From Swiss-Prot:
This is Alpha-mannosidase D. Residues 22-1170 are extracellular. Residues 493-554, 1202-1222 are annotated as: Disordered. The chain crosses the membrane at residues 1171-1191. It catalyses: Hydrolysis of terminal, non-reducing alpha-D-mannose residues in alpha-D-mannosides. One of its GO terms (molecular function) is carbohydrate binding. The keyword Ubl conjugation does not apply. Disulfide bonds: none annotated. Belongs to the glycosyl hydrolase 38 family. GO terms for cellular component: extracellular matrix; lysosome; membrane.
Length: 1222
């Protein structure tokens, strides 16, 4: 019996061993988690790993960097305030508490807008904890922008602004400088990103949303880490080390705290994930994101779950072939990655390598190299024809308002900065102006906020977009106020230090009086406004220094329409501000309102340039002609050609003459001419002759410079689809239809300055017109000196304005088709810094060939006999393509009642009206190399006009420029703004648009930058105005170009890397100290030469020289009659301006966004239920019908049979009753 039991035990034990072995081998059973690993097993594993490491090298062991983070959108499904109060404040408080309790824990934070708000809510104890966490390198800031910006629809100016706002706050508040970036949610990536970020001192970048097929390829060839070159012209200067996330920025599945896995399953799944991940990388340095959207709202729970499996892996690193695994900052990861690449010359440069070939040699040994990528990552696709190209255009009105508000912010920054500089010797004025600084910074924060990748893209819930629209309105009103007060402090001569220098500048002032139009030097010492509108010739530049009274009840205001009704005894000062660093001669337009049918008054309107007392030509066009539409009744457009000094101001008087015989020879009132067809007229100016089809759209253009005649087919179209959404443009199952093909009315206006053809569609009542198209060409009446020698910049394009509503389930385009143009499917789009090459792929549908456009799209002829370029400039971000040779297609509006289920979970129902303009140019390629960027900058930096009704005002400057001369033609003054402590920030951009008669190097040593503003501490900085740092590692990497990479276009159009940089010479007039980037300088006259490469943006900071010995003391007895009156301006503007503002001069309707309340859950159509219902319902219905027919048939047959039977019975009965008797 005992032997029998023993045998059974042996059998059971043997079977158990076999089963256990089977589980280990075939089911990957984790026996160590059941029994643990004893010392013998650990020694055995250690021995095995030592053998493996000896064979493969210790570098084969994995270094795992766990990156805790929370992706906090600045608006998406909730608005900014909602996210902060409901989630973000708890995330930050919880994370800080957890990090403070455990020094091993780390956290990475991106969105400084949220963090700064949270910081302001904390007490000093909590703030000190944060400082300690930063010092302990537990809390890290990555990217450091105010938000995480979009890369397709945000302009480079706005991207730089939002990054600068974050970087400046971090430096000022926490003395923190960001070194690595985390762009993990934008829907595709622009090549401008590595250029901009590297110029800010950022050394490495993490990206995520790369198209599925591209990312799969990158994994297969181990190119998830690569060097990204943003610009061919800048070379290594624009390069950055990039690491791509494996799948997404969320937790890997098995370690997600929200997933219900046991510890064993977590470890087993995660280690398998690590093994798979390592096969896609050249390095054994692995980065694992621990987070997702708005994670760590319960930081204690999230950290406790991860702490458990991290500890288990740390205790058994040898077994899992892990060198280290830990919570980490992004800085730690990149430092380890860089070290791994450079260690043992793995990716280091050798003496004999060629960095642009695929193979490198060092003697007989092959040296590996990192992939060098020189394109962008557009469009973004998630497969199944899901191309994220719709958001390039989604919410076109919002995109325009953001760009428009950004320009207003730029004007506000410039004028405030100059007002500070001009009043630097008056403490009272400085104190008054500085009360505006907080407003100014808050307005910048608003511009920064709307660059978020779900705001400027239009891909948030509608109520969220409405919240941002309201923020933009508020910032505009605030900027109106800042500009208004800055103008007072700039132009009121007794209010700045100009008068203190008058005696030293009489000679210059007299020269200016003798040559008003040609000399921009010393414009601050010009004449003052007088009550008669004439100019004083006083050498001191003041008509009456003892009577400098200012009517503060009438500030400089932004006006929608200047009301000239019953104002014959008054005149207006129109002050135009030029935000460009070049002198501007161009057409401008503004609205006026007069009494009904008062042609005599209209013909008596005069516009006089104040500085020269010279009446200039104007042309007046009515906005409506024959209706009773009250909203625009008696509204007119006034056109004029004005001259503006670089970065400066010029004043014009708008008045009505008193005399009955006051008809002005310089005022042309255009009478409307109703046409039956659009081809009854042509347009002509110095540059072009334009002919039209019968429907009023462009048909032919003649370039008078080259005598080239081209047939241009201009058309509107609409795609109909039910598969698109806020993000996705999907033409599958849809059709392309003609749109705006037959206008109901043609109205033609002509004159000396403008030819205009207006087409109206859907006209029942003029007020209810559905769509408007306005064709316009600008003409030069030779009022500007030297205008005969060169066309005005506004003459270089044909302008097409349109006003259309969003049609449901329609995506509207405008197309330009150049006949007989061979461009070999190649076209170019502007990314804000430079043009990028695109190739239309005919194997893909049109939506897969759309690309983002910030400034323009263009075609170039590739045939040998032609060298023409065709460019369409845009006024906002759009999507565009070239679907056939010679054709440019631009999407201008889209709306749908379906969602694409990419997270918004609500349809993008944008039925609102969008008023916009496009600008068509044709020219020689060489001419456009010089002009295209300048034209684009002029279009997006239109002069800003402010109005003052003046009566008994004296002592005002009439013309002003802070620059002694305009900047070289290829140097764009991108930014001038005041930072903290009155430090001034300056950015200069070499757009490489050089004069055809000059070389690429521009030398401006004959001038200084600023006219009389004395500056000190001139320092070159990074792009966000922090200390200039160079990435010393980037030029140590060996690189190669993978010609098999699946993205085949997106590279720079031109490379100017071998051309010399432009030279800008700064002088400090021999009075102050100018210090270069290395903090060298002398206290005497210093000349500073700045070299700016083509396509490079350089940044500087400096201080205005506050002359303390001349500062007026601030005391209570001083009567400050120039005190800022912010309340008045705000009240005026809020009530009469911003709420009833027109987008363009031709607009019939005020701006009216169509936002709606889409909070909560959207009831998604149940397509499966519909299919099942139809699948079951249709056969069932047919069956019921068949049954009914059969039953009916049988009933009828039975009834017929019964009737026949009854008839037979009756007949028999009758026969039986028949009398046969004779």
């Amino acid at each position: 019996m005992e032997s029998s039991k023993f045998v059974k035990i042996i059998w059971v034990f043997g079977i158990w061993i076999l089963v256990f072995t089977f589980l280990i081998i075939y089911n990957n059973y984790d026996y160590k988690s059941t029994f643990g690993i004893n010392k013998f097993e650990k020694r055995s594993l250690k021995t095995i790993n030592q053998i493996n490491n000896k064979e493969n090298g210790d570098d084969k062991k994995l270094s795992v960097f766990l990156i805790p983070h929370s992706h906090c959108d600045g608006g998406w499904l909730q608005d900014y305030d909602g996210y902060y109060y409901n989630i973000v404040q708890y995330i930050l408080s919880g994370v800080v508490n957890e990090l403070n309790l455990d020094k091993e824990k780390k956290f990475n934070w991106v969105e400084i807008g949220f963090f700064s708000r949270w910081w302001n809510d904390q007490n000093e104890i909590q703030k000190e904890i944060v400082r300690n966490l930063i010092n302990n390198k537990q809390l890290s800031f990555i990217s450091g922008g105010w938000v995480q910006n979009d890369e397709a629809t945000a302009t480079i100016d706005d991207v730089i602004t939002q990054m600068t706002q974050g970087h400046q706050w971090l430096k000022d508040t926490l003395n923190y400088t960001v070194e690595y970036a985390w762009q993990i949610d934008p829907f595709g990536y622009s090549s401008s990103t590595p250029t901009i970020f590297s110029s800010m001192g950022i050394k490495g970048l993490v990206i995520n949303r790369v198209s599925n097929d591209v990312k799969s390829y990158m994994k297969s060839v181990k190119e998830m880490e690569f060097i990204w070159k943003g610009s061919e012209s800048l070379g290594e200067q624009s390069q950055m080390l990039v690491s791509t996330l494996n799948i997404h920025y969320d937790y890997p599945k098995h370690i997600d705290p929200k997933k219900d896995f046991s510890l064993n399953d977590r470890i087993k799944g995660f280690t398998k994930y690590l093994n798979d991940l390592s096969k896609t990388r050249e390095s054994n340095i692995l980065m694992i994101p621990l987070g997702d959207d708005f994670r760590y709202s319960n930081a204690k729970t999230e950290f406790s779950v991860s702490k458990e499996w991290v500890k288990a892996l740390q205790d058994n690193k040898e077994y899992y072939n892990i060198k280290e695994i830990k919570y980490a900052t992004l800085d730690e990861y990149f430092i380890a990655l860089e070290d791994s690449f450079l260690r043992n010359n793995k990716f280091g440069k050798s003496r004999k390598q060629n960095v642009y070939t695929e193979t490198f040699s060092d003697g007989d040994d092959e040296v590996s190299a990192l992939s060098l990528y020189n394109k962008d990552f557009f469009p973004y696709s998630t497969g199944n024809l899901e191309y994220w190209t719709g958001y390039y255009t989604t919410r076109p009105l919002l995109k325009r308002l953001i760009r428009e508000s950004s320009l207003l912010q730029k004007s506000s920054d410039i004028l405030y900065t100059l007002a500070i500089g001009e009043n630097s010797n008056n403490q009272i004025d400085i104190n008054n102006l500085q009360t505006l600084s907080n407003q100014l910074n808050e307005n910048r924060n608003t511009i920064a906020l709307v660059q978020h990748h779900d705001i400027v893209t239009g891909t948030s819930r509608s109520f969220v977009l409405n919240d941002n629209f309201q923020r933009l309105q508020k910032s505009r009103i605030s900027n109106y106020n800042i500009i208004s007060n800055s103008l007072e402090y700039l132009l009121n001569k007794s209010n700045n230090k100009t008068n203190n220098n008058n005696n030293n500048n009489n000679k210059n002032n007299n020269n200016n009086n003798n040559n008003n139009n040609n000399n921009n030097n010393n414009l601050k010492n010009t004449n003052s406004i007088s009550t008669t509108g004439s100019s004083s010739s006083s050498g001191s530049g003041s008509s009456n220094n003892n009577n400098n009274t200012v009517n503060k009840s009438e500030p400089f205001n932004f006006e929608n329409a200047i009301d000239l009704s019953n104002e014959s005894n008054n005149q207006y000062s129109l002050v135009f501000h030029n935000t460009l660093g070049w002198e501007v001669n161009q057409h401008v337009s503004f609205r006026i309102k007069v009494n009904k049918n008062d042609n005599q008054l209209l013909e008596s309107i005069q516009l006089v340039e104040a500085i020269s007392n010279k009446t200039i030509q104007i042309q007046i066009i009515p906005i409506q002609d024959d209706s009773n539409c009250q909203s625009i009744e008696n509204n007119y457009i006034v056109f004029a050609i004005i001259n503006l000094p670089p970065l400066g101001l010029n004043t014009y008087y708008l008045s009505i003459a008193n005399s009955e015989d006051s008809k002005s020879n310089f005022t042309y009132l255009s009478k409307p001419k109703l046409l039956k067809k659009g081809n009854e007229i042509n347009f002509n100016n110095n540059r072009f002759k334009v002919e039209f089809e019968s429907n009023g759209l462009i048909s032919k253009i003649t370039d008078k410079n080259s005598n080239e005649i081209k047939t241009i087919e201009q058309t509107f179209h609409q795609y109909s689809t039910k598969k698109s959404g806020p993000y996705i443009f999907n033409v599958k199952g849809g059709k392309k239809h003609g749109f705006l093909e037959n206008p109901d009315k043609f109205i033609y206006h002509d004159g000396p300055l403008v030819s205009q053809l207006t087409m109206l569609y859907g006209v029942d009542d003029y007020c209810n017109v559905t769509s408007i198209v306005v064709q316009r060409i600008y003409k030069n009446n030779n009022e500007i000196n030297n205008s005969n020698s060169k066309s005005l910049i506004t003459e270089n394009y044909i302008e097409t304005g349109y006003s259309i509503n969003g049609d449901m389930n329609r995506e509207t385009t405008i197309n330009y088709k150049v006949k007989d143009l061979e461009n070999d499917d190649i076209f170019y789009t502007d990314n804000g810094l430079e043009s990028r090459k695109r190739i239309y792929n005919h194997d893909r549908s049109v939506n897969q060939n759309y690309y983002p456009v910030l400034g323009y799209i263009k075609l170039k002829e590739t045939s040998e006999n032609n060298n023409h370029q065709y460019t369409v400039y845009v006024d906002r971000s759009v999507g565009a393509t070239s679907p056939s040779d010679g054709e440019m297609e631009i999407m201008i509006h889209r709306t749908m009642d379906t969602d694409d289920w990419k997270g918004v979970n609500w349809p993008s129902k944008d039925i609102g009206r969008s008023d916009a303009k496009l600008y068509f140019n044709m020219d020689l390629v060489n001419n456009q190399l010089q002009n295209e960027k300048r034209i684009s900058l002029h279009i997006t930096n239109q002069p800003i006009m402010f109005v003052k009704k003046h009566n008994n005002q004296t002592g005002y400057l009439l013309k002003y420029s802070p620059l002694s001369n305009q900047l070289p033609s290829n140097i764009h003054l991108q930014s001038l703004l005041t930072l903290k402590n009155n430090t001034v920030g300056l950015r200069l951009f070499n757009i490489h648009e050089v004069d055809s008669n000059t070389q690429s190097t521009t030398d401006t040593d004959k001038s200084t930058l600023f006219n009389e503003l004395e500056i000190s501490n001139f320092i070159e900085t990074g792009l966000s105005f922090l200390k200039l740092t160079k990435n010393n590692l980037i030029d140590k990497f060996s690189t190669r170009i993978n010609k098999k990479f699946p993205i085949k276009c997106g590279e720079s159009e031109y490379s100017f890397i071998n051309e010399k940089p432009s030279s800008i010479i700064f002088s400090n007039n021999g009075t102050n100290n100018i210090i270069d980037g290395e903090n060298k300088g002398e206290n005497n006259k210093t000349i500073e030469t700045i070299q700016i490469k083509p396509h490079e943006i350089k940044s500087f900071t400096f201080n205005f020289n506050f002359q303390l010995d001349q500062i007026i003391p601030n005391n209570n007895n001083n009567n400050n009659k120039y005190a800022i009156n912010k309340e008045l301006n705000n009240e005026y503007i809020e009530q009469s301006i911003e709420n009833q503002r027109y987008e363009y001069d031709f607009s019939f309707f005020p701006i009216k966004p169509t936002f709606y309340d889409d909070r909560g859950k959207y009831n998604r159509p149940n397509h499966l239920a519909l299919i099942l219902s139809l699948s079951i319902g249709i056969p069932a219905g047919i069956l019921i019908i068949v049954i009914a027919l059969v039953v009916t048939y049988k009933k009828r047959k039975n009834r017929k049979t019964l009737t026949s039977s009854n008839s037979s019975s009756n007949l028999i009965q009758q026969e039986d009753q028949t009398d046969y008797s004779p």
